[in-house]
């Protein structure tokens, strides 16, 4: 381990295997707090590289509680959080809408990072249990078409890093690992990142991790597809990364200001998302969710973004997405 420390302290990049070895030791509690702090800051100052991020993700996945992975195609739609936008929870709403569009979703989520209501906070408000077994989650995925995997339930080793992360009070590699360590290991994903500088390295990381097809996005300060600014996209397809930009017009939608997506208290966010999923929400909310679902559908093989957007909007207005919420809550 000292050889790995020395490489980091000399601003050298770790191999994927070295990073995997290092993070396996971290989540097993083998590093002291000063050692862990030094490691995280050394990587942050140099800039974490794709093979290091991939190695860390592989260590966390190897040590996660197992999930019975299905043999059919399924997706994740998730963001890093931490964008500071305090928006409504678009990725969680999009997961329900995508599911109602017949796309299987195994969504990995956690408590809030920067908004007042993360995906798990919102699910709890809907009466959806967070601590169900992997077998029950798989059953929900099979029968309803959607399940949620609560990160702390699967990644118990995170607790060893938490005291240092709280003391450092700065972003580290742990802030970008969440979307990469879904224990269901989905072959397809739409991943939002909190900074445009992360789009390329996370896309390269997804290639290393073996995703079949995925898109990494950032838009005007938000970790998702947004309609107030161009969305920067790096799409993984057939082992290649394709870069492009999307605007509201590409989805057949009008632009909305970022302020139109502003969230509130957990109670407010729950009410706004409830109305949205029942087809009675604000137009800006419905359009934002439809755009994200449309891109996820493209990743799923449905290439026409405008057609996808209209299908998503019709699903939202029908209230079918809310039926998925009720079905999951009933199982809880």
Swiss-Prot record:
One of its GO terms (biological process) is L-tryptophan biosynthetic process. Anthranilate 2 binds at residue 165. It comes from the Bacteria. Its cofactor is Mg(2+). Anthranilate 1 binds at residues 79, 110. GO terms for molecular function: anthranilate phosphoribosyltransferase activity; magnesium ion binding. Mg(2+) 2 binds at residues 223-224. Binds 2 magnesium ions per monomer. The keyword Magnesium applies. Keywords: Amino-acid biosynthesis, Aromatic amino acid biosynthesis, Glycosyltransferase, Magnesium, Metal-binding, Transferase, Tryptophan biosynthesis. GO terms for cellular component: cytosol. Its EC number is 2.4.2.18. Mg(2+) 1 binds at residues 91, 224. Pfam families: Glycos_trans_3N, Glycos_transf_3. HAMAP family: TrpD. Catalyzes the transfer of the phosphoribosyl group of 5-phosphorylribose-1-pyrophosphate (PRPP) to anthranilate to yield N-(5'-phosphoribosyl)-anthranilate (PRA). Homodimer. Belongs to the anthranilate phosphoribosyltransferase family. This is Anthranilate phosphoribosyltransferase. It comes from Photorhabdus laumondii subsp. laumondii (strain DSM 15139 / CIP 105565 / TT01) (Photorhabdus luminescens subsp. laumondii). The gene is trpD.
């Amino acid at each position: 381990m000292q050889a790995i420390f020395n490489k980091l302290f000399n601003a050298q990049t770790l191999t994927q295997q070295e990073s995997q070895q290092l993070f396996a030791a971290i989540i097993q509690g083998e590093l002291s707090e000063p050692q862990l702090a030094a490691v995280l800051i050394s990587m942050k100052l140099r800039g974490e590289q794709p093979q290091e991020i991939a190695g860390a993700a592989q260590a966390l996945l190897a040590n996660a509680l197992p999930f019975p992975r299905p043999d059919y195609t399924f997706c994740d739609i998730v963001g890093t959080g931490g964008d500071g936008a305090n928006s409504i929870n678009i990725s969680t709403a999009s997961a329900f809408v995508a599911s109602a569009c017949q796309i299987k979703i195994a969504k990995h989520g956690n408590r809030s990072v920067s908004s007042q209501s993360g995906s798990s906070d919102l699910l709890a408000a809907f009466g959806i249990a967070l601590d169900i077994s992997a077998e029950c989650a798989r059953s929900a995925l099979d029968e309803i078409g959607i399940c949620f995997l609560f990160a702390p339930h699967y990644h118990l080793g995170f607790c060893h890093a938490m005291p240092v992360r709280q003391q450092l009070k700065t972003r580290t590699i742990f802030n970008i690992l969440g979307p990469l360590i879904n224990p269901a290991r989905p072959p397809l994903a739409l991943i939002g990142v909190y900074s445009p500088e992360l789009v390329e390295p996370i896309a390269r990381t997804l290639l290393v991790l073996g995703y079949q097809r995925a898109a990494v996005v950032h838009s005007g300060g938000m970790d998702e597809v947004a309609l107030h600014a161009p969305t920067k996209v790096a799409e993984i397809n057939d082992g290649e990364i394709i870069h492009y930009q999307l605007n509201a017009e590409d989805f057949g939608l009008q632009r909305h200001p970022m302020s139109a997506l502003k969230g509130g208290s957990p109670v407010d966010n729950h009410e706004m998302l409830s109305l949205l999923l029942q087809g009675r929400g604000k137009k800006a909310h419905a359009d934002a969710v439809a755009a994200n679902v449309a891109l996820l559908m493209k990743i799923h093989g449905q290439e026409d973004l405008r057609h996808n957007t209209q299908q998503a909007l019709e699903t939202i207005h029908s209230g079918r997405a809310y039926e998925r919420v009720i079905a999951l809550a009933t199982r809880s």
